[in-house]
A protein has these predicted regions:
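Post-HExxH zinc-binding segment in Zn-dependent metallohydrolases
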Residues: 44
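Feature responds to low-complexity, polar/acidic, surface-exposed segments characteristic
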Residues: 1-5, 13-36, 47-64, 74-151
Length: 151
């Protein structure tokens, strides 16, 4: 398991510099080792806390929280009204009203998209073929072993 604090610390290292935060953004991180990382990631809107103002830094991060953070880092924001009916749907992600529904769909479906009129949210235009990443890695290793290229 990886904690919410550990994941925030990893993500905050993608930033070029930290934020100067005078007051913690969550009520339960004042003496935590990852306090600055958590504040930095929250300032960029990459992570969120809970409605009661806490972050729960030592709680194990969920799949939904992790993919939401990764999507935020990559600035990938799907619009539920513009997903494609033919996308892969997961048995444990069928509740379209769940806060994480779009984030899971974004992270698990390869697709092309458009951003219209400066919109922040993606309109999916087509699904891409799922790649066999294990086979691609094997081909890459073999090609580089002999000085060739893959793709």
């Amino acid at each position: 398991n990886i904690t919410r604090a550990e994941f925030a610390a990893i993500a905050s290292r993608f930033m070029s510099s930290g934020y100067d935060v005078e007051e913690d953004l969550f009520t339960d991180i004042a003496n935590h080792w990852a306090r600055e990382n958590i504040n930095d990631a929250a300032m960029t809107k990459w992570i969120n806390g809970y409605p009661d103002g806490t972050f729960l830094p030592d709680k194990a991060i969920t799949r939904a929280e992790a993919v939401t953070l990764v999507n935020n880092v990559l600035q990938r924001k799907p619009d539920a009204d513009h997903l494609l009916d033919s996308m892969i749907k997961w048995p444990d992600n069928m509740d379209t009203s769940a806060w994480y529904y779009e984030a899971i769909q974004e992270a698990t479906n390869s697709h092309d998209y458009d951003l219209f009129d400066g919109a922040a949210y993606e309109t999916w235009t087509s699904l891409l073929e799922n790649r066999d990443w294990a086979a691609l890695e094997k081909d890459w290793v073999n090609a580089h072993r002999t000085g060739g290229e893959v793709m």
